[in-house]
C-alpha cells in the first residue's frame, strides 16, 4: 500500500536526489524557467516555494538556511536580492508547472517550471553576458 509515502524517489539515492534538486533549484533561480521531466518539476515546486518564503523573511538565519540547500552563493544572493522582494506581497504560489508534451526518445512526460511573474530577460542572460565578454576580448 502507498500510505504515507511523502515524495517521489525518482530511482535515486537520498544524496543524489538532494544534489539533483539543489542544482535544479539553482538553475530555476538563475534562469527563472527550466524544462525538465514532469515528476522532477512536481517535486521541485515545494522546494522552491520554501526557498522563496525564506527569501521573503530576509534575515541572516533564513539566508544561512537557503545557503545550506543551494550550491552557489550567487543563487542565494539572487534569491534574496531579486526574488524575495518581488514576491513580498504574494502569499505562496510563486512557481507554476506547465506540461510540455513528451520527450523524443523515451516518451518521458516533460514540463516547464517557471516563476509566476518571471523576468523574460533572465533566461539566457548569463550566456549573453559571456558572449559579449568574449567579443570584447577579441576586439
Swiss-Prot record:
Pfam family, one: Ribosomal_L17
Record keyword Signal present: no
Keywords: Ribonucleoprotein, Ribosomal protein
Coiled coil ranges: none
Protein origin, superkingdom: Bacteria
Gene3D superfamilies: Ribosomal protein L17 (3.90.1030.10)
Subunit-level organization: Part of the 50S ribosomal subunit. Contacts protein L32.
Family stated for the protein in its record: Belongs to the bacterial ribosomal protein bL17 family.
Protein name as it appears in the record: Large ribosomal subunit protein bL17
